[in-house]
């Protein structure tokens, strides 16, 4: 098998936040960048919108990972009349704050969603591998991604409108965005790296994700678009594959 071409650019991993107020966003969102394998940086102090502004300012080629769900379970999308991910993102922009009130099937105190309807297929795969992937409908508890996902989806539409491709709905390009799951990155080892600089869980998740992305950058740079209808509606999570 021919090896993928060598990627010559930067990778950016973002530990996201669903917080509503500015201060909570700026104290939790973290951005990690690896540029040449030896130099890397961590930064914070940005809101969601400002983080997307930062990404838009990155010179191509660039690979960007966000740790929130890019879609909803297919049954919910279809129930809302959505047949494409663009329609899901537009719906989140229009109705997302009402979902977070919450409105069923989103929940804070009691989950009424049957187990078989809580997760996207990629999350079911993660859970089958022993990872505690959360449902987008869950709005409370450690690791919940509901608010961040709902508030992040409209920003994916903005990135796409500005020239980024969003995997798995499109193939990788000079400017690619994809969904990451930092918990899965923690199994990787990075000899010689000073991981003590991660002074918070947010910094750790962004930093380790960026290092993992850099390690697998050549594969990331040639990701192909999904053809499966469910994946094209729900999205997918990129996971590092060890040869």
Where are these regions (language model features)?
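RNase H-like (RuvC/DEDD) metal-dependent nuclease/polynucleotide-processing core
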Residues: 2-12, 16-243
């Amino acid at each position: 098998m021919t090896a993928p071409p060598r990627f010559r650019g930067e990778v950016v991993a973002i530990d996201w936040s669903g917080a509503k107020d500015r201060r909570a966003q700026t104290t939790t969102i973290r951005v990690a960048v690896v540029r040449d394998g030896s130099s890397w940086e961590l930064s914070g102090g940005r809101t969601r919108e400002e983080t997307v502004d930062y990404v838009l300012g990155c010179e191509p080629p660039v690979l960007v990972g966000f740790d929130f769900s890019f879609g909803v379970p297919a049954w919910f999308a279809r129930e809302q009349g959505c047949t494409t991910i663009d329609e899901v993102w537009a719906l989140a922009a229009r109705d997302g704050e009402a979902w977070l009130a919450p409105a069923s099937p989103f929940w804070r105190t009691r989950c009424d969603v049957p187990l078989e309807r809580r997760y996207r297929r990629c999350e079911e795969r993660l859970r089958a591998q022993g990872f505690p992937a959360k449902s987008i409908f869950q709005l409370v508890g450690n690791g919940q991604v509901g608010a961040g996902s709902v508030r992040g989806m409209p920003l994916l539409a903005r990135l796409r409108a500005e020239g980024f491709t969003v995997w798995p709905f499109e193939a990788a390009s000079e400017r690619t965005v994809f969904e990451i799951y930092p918990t899965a990155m923690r199994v990787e080892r990075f000899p010689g790296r000073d991981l003590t600089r991660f002074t918070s869980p947010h910094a750790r998740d962004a930093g380790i994700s960026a290092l993992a992305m850099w390690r697998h950058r050549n594969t990331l740079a040639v990701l192909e678009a999904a053809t499966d209808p469910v994946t094209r509606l729900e999205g997918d999570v990129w996971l590092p594959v060890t040869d």
